[in-house]
UniProtKB/Swiss-Prot annotation:
Chief location of this protein within or outside the cell: cytoplasm
Main function: Synthesizes cyclic GMP (cGMP) from GTP. May be involved in sensitivity to quinine by regulating egl-4 activity through the production of cGMP.
Regulation: May be regulated by molecular oxygen. Probably not activated by nitric oxide (NO).
Protein name from the UniProt record: Soluble guanylate cyclase gcy-34
Source organism per UniProt: Caenorhabditis elegans
Miscellaneous section: There are two types of guanylate cyclases: soluble forms and membrane-associated receptor forms.
């Protein structure tokens, strides 16, 4: 069904029950929010039935009640969105409105939305007692409750009537059409006026329910002054049928689209046309039953075949006609290249003949050219000329709307993808900068450099220079990734900030951007954890576990964001320089701390330090230093978040760390190891 039906159902539920109820309906029916109500989209009947079933279940109302409620709301909603004037101007009474409902339905389907949908048909009869008998035909059984809601609401809003609709009969039959067999439901409604309508003084006295036949008075001269030739030229596409549905006469323009042999009087109309709408067998009785409907007939001959047949002999043309009829019987008729006629069937006064007053069903310039026609083929009085020009503009508007809907859908997809990419970018920025600083930067705040009391740590691999000459570059990168991955885990675990890595040098800081008085204690624990983690990575040259060289210093630093395109959080000050010297002047397998770090660490924590003595630091002279041995407050297992094997490991874990360092120092290294001259060594990465 057409998307407008879904949208009106959505409006009904939201207005009467709220947005939350509609979301429940969507969840139950399996529709994605925003994809269930695309107005110009065609949904399968199954989709619509699932949607209505979900509404019925969520609201705990029967489906018949939902359909009747929808029928009434459909009129209200349609009049709200711009169809008000058209609905009110259709007829002065309810019977006339119902008689013209087919044409309105056809106009909306085929002209406004260009949808070619399979709609219902209506026929209204007036009873002697003033009541109406409405015949409703549809190929979708079970939807007649919509008609009850529609007719009641139209009577109330347009004609100020309070009516009752009673189902008098409901039958189903199988109808054989050219395109196959289908089930058709026929429902008969009896319409009664419950209360006399309220009429203003300036309103016509004509009944609002039924029509009154006009009185033409005496006709002075009943002789027709128009000849058959003039009539055929004035109505160039008409034809007249008898009770046997055989051709009696036709308009001039039909000879340009249909072979002359088929337009001879007495030719069965089924040899010339097939019926598209209403979907009924093309015979005299059915035409009379649907006399108020819009009839669309399709010529069985294409324009190209007609031109080809004009050059044939009479016998060849007869053979071609027979071949054409065989194609129709085998459903090989191509819809796109056969002219359609749209118009009205009218019973003549003899009651034995029907005239079909019609025009080519052409709604655009492209279709006009397709049949080899020009605007001059339409009489000046024919509104089809104006319709073609107006609909050409309408098609452009519909195309623009479809493009806008496609663009909106694409924009939603791009917005979602952009949000995903933005989250990735934010995540990367938060990895590059402290989380607090990254949030301030993303919110557009101006960040001023700040002064902090913090502890800075540098560590490196003293044996790294021995590895470079004997390892492939990709193996070196793999080795550093393995080491730094383990160090990063300790940094995240202990809540300090990793500033940067340069070659094999690793720099971290504690106490910024969120100040803590335990910055020295935290960094000492990080150093012990890193020393433990490094023991699981093997030196590919010496075949021994790696030893880190670590240096710590505490003091005042300046920190701030440098750069805009690629912002970095940088540290400045003498504290950074001295921490770097603590590392470069340190010993492999040892954690060297300045006296400032020693003092700060002992204020908040409990550690075992071994005095190293005074060492000469460039620019500072002799500086008192200490080696950090162990923490008396936390075990290795608590620092590294590793589970202790009670059958193998000591309680604190520092004994294993000391033994590991002693074994790894069988080959003694000073602070500046010499490069290994044995270039024949092989490099293997564990």
């Amino acid at each position: 069904m057409f998307g407008f039906i879904h949208e009106s159902i959505r409006q009904l539920v939201i207005r009467k029950y709220g947005e939350d109820v509609w979301l429940q309906v969507l969840e139950r029916s399996g529709f994605e929010n925003g994809k269930e109500n695309i107005v110009n989209h065609y949904y399968s009947d199954t989709d619509t039935y699932v949607l209505v079933d979900s509404v019925s279940i969520v609201l705990k109302v029967t489906k018949d009640q939902i359909w009747e409620m929808y029928g009434g709301f459909l009129i209200t909603y349609s009049m709200e969105i711009g169809w008000d004037e058209l609905v009110r101007s259709m007829s002065p009474n309810l019977k006339g409105f119902l008689d013209n409902l087919d044409s309105l339905h056809y106009f909306i389907d085929h002209v406004v939305y260009k949808a070619n949908l399979r709609g219902p048909s209506f026929r209204c009869e007036e009873n002697p007692d003033g009541t109406l008998m409405l015949h409703y035909f549809t190929g979708r059984p079970g939807l007649y409750h919509i008609v009850k809601g529609v007719v009641k609401e139209v009577a109330k809003l347009v004609f100020n009537l309070d009516i009752s609709l009673v189902v008098q009969g409901r039958t189903q039959r199988s109808v054989h059409m050219n395109n196959g067999e289908r089930v058709e439901e026929h429902v008969i409604f009896l319409i009664k006026n419950v209360e006399e309508p309220r009429r203003d003084s300036d309103t016509s006295t004509t009944s609002a329910l039924t029509s009154v036949e006009p009185d033409f008075g005496e006709i002075i001269d009943d002789n027709l002054k128009v000849s058959l030739q003039d009539f055929s030229r004035a109505l160039p596409y008409h034809f007249v049928l008898d009770e046997s549905c055989r051709l009696v006469q036709c308009g001039d323009e039909l000879y340009n689209h249909i072979p002359n042999e088929l337009l001879q009087p007495g030719t069965p109309i089924l040899r010339i046309f097939e019926i598209n709408r209403p979907q009924i067998p093309l015979d005299f009785e059915n035409i009379c039953n649907f006399i108020n409907a819009v009839f669309v007939l399709q010529v069985k001959t294409s324009p190209l075949r007609k031109k080809h047949m004009n050059a044939m002999t009479k016998e060849e043309r007869e053979q071609e006609v027979e071949a054409m009829e065989e194609e129709v019987e085998s459903n090989e008729l191509t819809q796109g290249c056969h002219l359609k006629l749209k118009g009205q069937m009218m019973m003549l006064s003899t009651k034995k003949h029907i005239i079909y007053l019609c025009s080519p069903y052409v709604t655009s310039i492209n279709e006009l050219m397709q049949f080899g026609m020009r605007l001059t083929a339409m009489p000046l009085h024919d509104a089809t000329r104006d319709l073609i020009l107006l609909n050409q503009q309408r098609l452009s508007d519909v195309e623009v709307n479809l493009q806008l809907e496609a663009n909106n859908e694409q924009l939603e997809t791009m917005t979602h993808e952009l949000e995903v990419e933005r989250q990735k970018t934010d995540s990367i920025l938060k990895d590059m900068l402290p989380r607090k600083i990254a949030k301030q930067l993303l919110s557009g705040e101006h960040l001023e450099p700040c002064e902090y009391e913090a502890t800075v740590m540098f560590c490196d691999l003293p044996a790294f220079q021995q590895i470079i000459p004997v390892c492939q570059p990709k193996n070196i990168v793999k080795l550093l990734n393995e080491v730094f991955f383990k160090l990063d885990r300790i940094v995240v675990l202990r809540g300090v900030y990793k500033v940067e890595t340069v070659s094999d040098s690793y720099m971290t800081v504690s106490g910024i951007p969120d100040y803590t008085s335990e910055h020295a204690e935290n960094m000492c624990h990080v150093a012990l954890g890193m020393m433990w983690e490094a023991r699981s990575v093997m030196d590919p040259v010496n075949k021994t576990p790696f030893l880190l060289r670590i240096g710590l210093h505490s003091g005042t630093i300046i920190a701030g964001v440098v750069g805009t395109k690629m912002p970095r959080y940088c540290l400045f000050g003498e504290t950074v320089t001295l921490a770097s010297q603590m590392e470069s002047l340190g010993v492999a397998g040892k954690i060297q701390c300045s006296s400032w770090t020693y003092s700060k660490a002992m204020e908040t924590g409990r550690f075992e330090f071994s005095p190293r003595g005074r060492i000469n630091v460039k620019g500072r002279g002799d500086v008192e230093t200490y080696f950090l041995m162990r923490s008396l407050k936390k075990s290795i297992w608590e620092i590294t978040d590793h589970e202790r094997d009670v059958n193998v490991n000591s309680i604190e874990g520092y004994e294993e760390l000391e033994i590991f360092i002693e074994n790894a120092q069988t080959v003694k290294h000073d602070g500046h190891p010499k490069a290994n001259q044995n270039h024949s060594a092989t490099c293997t990465i564990a």
